[in-house]
């Protein structure tokens, strides 16, 4: 069993049970999935940019991403409906815990001037969104092979009903929130 999953079962669940007075163990919020999304706007002019983004996401997530396409045409961006414009990957189960563990313990501390992640990035339904400015914070990415620094969005979807419960869940799992 994954290190983070073990921590969740042994420490986080009992702590949340006592803090929020849940009657059943099934009420305790858990992480449902993690979605990593990388928008590649320059794929319109340069289709090869998308291939490198897909490759990088595959290395980061450990599974192949889905290429996302434009929903509608925008003339100002020279964009046609259905053009490939980004990549996303949805992680569940073991891979999700492995990725979260790696994100918390290895990648986030590698961010320059890192002071913790924002406490305000919850959406009101218990989901947390985290923006990353560069893909170089992940140890799998080789600095010399990167042709362009790209950011990504990481959405952590939980079963929590309120932001407070989700914040407590992530904090107990080791998410470095700002003081």
From Swiss-Prot:
SUPFAM superfamilies in the record = RL5-like (SSF55282)
Query: Which GO molecular function terms does the record list?
Result: rRNA binding; structural constituent of ribosome; tRNA binding
Changing residue 33 to A has the effect of: A 3-fold decrease in binding of the 5S rRNA
Q: What, per the annotation, is the impact of changing residue 63 to A?
A: A 12.5-fold decrease in binding of the 5S rRNA
Q: Name one Pfam family in it.
A: Ribosomal_L5_C
Alphabetized, the UniProt keywords read: Ribonucleoprotein, Ribosomal protein, RNA-binding, rRNA-binding, tRNA-binding
CC terms in the record's Gene Ontology section: ribonucleoprotein complex; ribosome
Question: InterPro entries this protein is in?
Answer: Ribosomal_uL5, Ribosomal_uL5_bac-type, Ribosomal_uL5_C, Ribosomal_uL5_CS, Ribosomal_uL5_dom_sf, Ribosomal_uL5_N
Q: What is the effect of changing residue 37 to A?
A: A 25-fold decrease in binding of the 5S rRNA
User: A biological process (GO) annotation for this entry?
Assistant: translation
Q: Please indicate which superkingdom the organism of origin belongs to.
A: Bacteria
The observed outcome of changing residue 77 to A is:
An 8-fold decrease in binding of the 5S rRNA
Function field: This is one of the proteins that bind and probably mediate the attachment of the 5S RNA into the large ribosomal subunit, where it forms part of the central protuberance. In the 70S ribosome it contacts protein S13 of the 30S subunit (bridge B1b), connecting the 2 subunits; this bridge is implicated in subunit movement. Contacts the P site tRNA; the 5S rRNA and some of its associated proteins might help stabilize positioning of ribosome-bound tRNAs.
Question: Could you describe the subunit structure of this protein?
Answer: Contacts the P site tRNA. Forms a bridge to the 30S subunit in the 70S ribosome. Part of the 50S ribosomal subunit. Part of the 5S rRNA/L5/L18 subcomplex; in this organism only 2 proteins, L5 and L18 have been shown to be part of the 5S rRNA subcomplex, unlike E.coli and T.thermophilus where L25 (TL5) is also found. Has been shown to bind 5S rRNA.
What the record says about family reads:
Belongs to the universal ribosomal protein uL5 family.
This protein is called Large ribosomal subunit protein uL5
Organism from which the protein derives: Geobacillus stearothermophilus (Bacillus stearothermophilus)
From the broadest rank down, the organism's phylogenetic lineage runs:
Bacteria, Bacillati, Bacillota, Bacilli, Bacillales
